[in-house]
Amino acid sequence: MTYTGKSIKRLNDDKFITGRSNYIDDIKIPSLYAGFVRSPYPHAIIKRIDATDALKVNGIVAVFSGKDINPMLKGGVGVLSAYVNPSLFRFKERKAFPEDNKVKYVGEPVAIVIGQDKYAVRDAIDRVNVEYEQLKPVIKMEDAEKDEVIVHDELKTNVSYKIPFKAGDIEKAFSQADKVVKVEAINERLIPNPMEPRGILSVYDGNSLSVWYSTQVPHFARSEFARIFGIPETKIRVAMPDVGGAFGSKVHIMAEELAVIASSILLRRPVRWTATRSEEMLASEARSNVFTGEVAVKKDGTVLGIKGKLLLDLGAYLTLTAGIQPTIIPVMIPGPYKVRDLEIESTAVYTTTPPITMYRGASRPEATYIIERIMSTVADELGLDDVTIRERNLIDQLPYTNPFGLRYDTGDYIRVFKDGVAKLEYNELRKWAQQERSKGHRVGVGLAFYLEICSFGPWEYGEIKVDNKGNVLVITGTTPHGQGTETAIAQIVADALQIPIEKIRVVWGDTDIVEGSFGTYGSRSLTIGGSAALKVAERVLDKMKRAAASYFNADVQEIRYENEEFSVKNDPSKKASWDEIASLATTKEPIVEKIYYENDVTFPYGVHVAVVEVDDLGMARVVEYRAYDDIGKVINPALAEAQIHGGGVQGVGQALYEKAIINENGQLSVTYADYYVPTAVEAPRFISYFADKSHPSNYPTGTKGVGEAALIVGPAAIIRAIEDAVGARFTKTPTPPEEIYKAIMSKK
């Protein structure tokens, strides 16, 4: 049986649907519980912390603050240098508590309370008395850029990063323009909402440190813990149990995790902490940027040049991946289009708000929203339709190096765009919408095209072990946490070894078992991790063939292998099963192969269409979402389609509902009463296809990545659909009902 290309059911779902999963809170190790005293102010000096009353609470073991924990740390959390050049940013590594005794956002931890049960800890938190001297906050990016209120005194400015991205001759492009079109694209601050909040359990025995951690990057976490705490990596184990979602937010190491580990070291006792939903919403936020610019165009819709300013909010601290936004968004703004002349000033600033982290798409949604806003706005200004403007500007030959040096790999953008428009029946939907509007029904259809960068390297680890019964253990450096990647990897290995998938087990996420790992994020897992597994499977099969040759006393070139059976080409009577050769081979030496597989990034792309209804009060609802994607070779169509559906629902959230509301006093609403996340009720009907003539990547798997596609392009398609329904221009995600209502009323 061939497994690749088939919708094989996920291999590990039984434990999740029967309640046998094992999350951080399920780990049965007797431990102390931690909780945090947090700042009620966005900007203030800590004058005094008095834990006297808290320590009187029955069951409370300790209360630690910065003076107790920060001196233990050899460093703090910095930036992910694999993708971000730290020298380009002004920043200070973040320790467990503010080193300057100055809080910089509402909810910043100022002390950790340790107790025998979580309820005592919650009581004690309220009895820690903290005296503050309030300072003036700076909430808006535009105000922070003025440097009138400085967030980090030692940096002497709020501007962490300011780089002009220039390509071609922008002045020449604008001098040749028939028209200059102004464009604005706003991505509001939003909050990743995995079902399981962050959690950690730290055990220190005086010699070694064991950490169970809800993370996407266990090996990176181990390296950082070793650096920060001065403990050799060989003495640290980081284990990733089942993780209830992440969406990029669990790539980060936050201050709370450092405090929990430090407390377990100080007390020589296990300490655990799981964030409440409010704490999760305070700690993990994303997006928050504004693009304002001008576009030079010809009358026929040809885009000659783009210039503008990208202003990004970092929040109070530069987190591990926040630096990706100001560096990747500008270079991805050209997208799949031929524009060669650009000048984008990218500026990232600190504000007294919760730090910005990573969220599904991580810079690609912003870049896509900007370039698709440009295309749609130019189309409106020139009286062109959305199909014509894109066809006129799409890259027509690949591979292609974009103006900032990114090499787009394989594909046919124009053909896939045309095929997608036809397959998704976009033109037919437009006619239907016009007919419905003539009847008084406010409906709209929006289209957007995307190109994303995926499969970030620089490498991924793969290892395979074959036991004496022929069973195969695949050890992957990827870290699945809901995507089903382990099933797809098993499919790849089963086909490579020509054995039943039931003989394969895939493991990940434990630094004591997995030699190396970069983790799961950026739609990289199946492409680079699956390719590592495929290459190492080929090595294993070669070793098994050599074992068979030895058994048959034949040359290895004479060995034929097919459907679990080894035989000699010129003597078919000599044959043995996979299991038999495995049994013989492992008596002498184990069958083990490993690889650190390296390759370059990939660029999947596609066209998505949204259909919306808008009522008289401005409430928009996405009723149908259609997708046509070229993601290279599709290993498991059901898993790939599930990623489109999940990303599409999150795209609905970003386009219509999700905005972290921070008032002028820095107070953030941290409940679902104020932060709306789409549920199954708001989910649209999905129709999704993968390109009839796909273009495989240069990876052994031929895959490109699909995990973020729909959230990358969805907001642009949905906002365009609202514009079609209402007949007005909108610039931001989310576009709230009150703005839609104002536009409706202005038409009357």
Swiss-Prot record:
Optimum pH is 6.7. At pH 6.7, glyceraldehyde is the predominant substrate, however at pH 7.5 the dehydrogenase exhibits activity preferentially towards the aliphatic aldehydes such as formaldehyde, acetaldehyde and propionaldehyde. InterPro entries: Ald_Oxase/Xan_DH_a/b, Ald_Oxase/Xan_DH_a/b_sf, Ald_Oxase/xanthine_DH-like, AldOxase/xan_DH_MoCoBD1, AldOxase/xan_DH_MoCoBD2, AldOxase/xan_DH_Mopterin-bd_sf, Glyceraldehyde_dh-related. Its cofactor is Mo-molybdopterin guanine dinucleotide. Keywords: Cytoplasm, Metal-binding, Molybdenum, Oxidoreductase. One of its GO terms (molecular function) is iron ion binding. Pfam families: Ald_Xan_dh_C (PF01315), MoCoBD_1 (PF02738), MoCoBD_2 (PF20256). One of its GO terms (cellular component) is cytoplasm. Mo-molybdopterin guanine dinucleotide binds at F247, R360, G522. Its EC number is 1.2.99.8. The keyword Transferase does not apply. It is found in: Cytoplasm. It catalyses: D-glyceraldehyde + A + H2O = (R)-glycerate + AH2 + H(+). Binds 1 Mo-molybdopterin guanine dinucleotide (Mo-MGD) cofactor per subunit. It comes from the Archaea. Heterotrimer composed of a large chain (CutA), a medium chain (CutB) and a small chain (CutC). Belongs to the xanthine dehydrogenase family. Component of the glyceraldehyde dehydrogenase which is involved the nonphosphorylated Entner-Doudoroff pathway. Catalyzes the oxidation of D-glyceraldehyde to yield glycerate. When the artificial electron acceptor 2,6-dichlorophenol-indophenol (Cl2Ind) is used, the enzyme shows a broad substrate range (glyceraldehyde-3-phosphate, formaldehyde, acetaldehyde, propionaldehyde and isobutyraldehyde), but is most active with D-glyceraldehyde. It is not known which acceptor is utilized in vivo. PANTHER family: ALDEHYDE OXIDASE 1-RELATED, XANTHINE DEHYDROGENASE. This is Glyceraldehyde dehydrogenase large chain. It comes from Sulfolobus acidocaldarius (strain ATCC 33909 / DSM 639 / JCM 8929 / NBRC 15157 / NCIMB 11770). The lineage of its organism: Archaea, Thermoproteota, Thermoprotei, Sulfolobales, Sulfolobaceae. The gene is cutA.
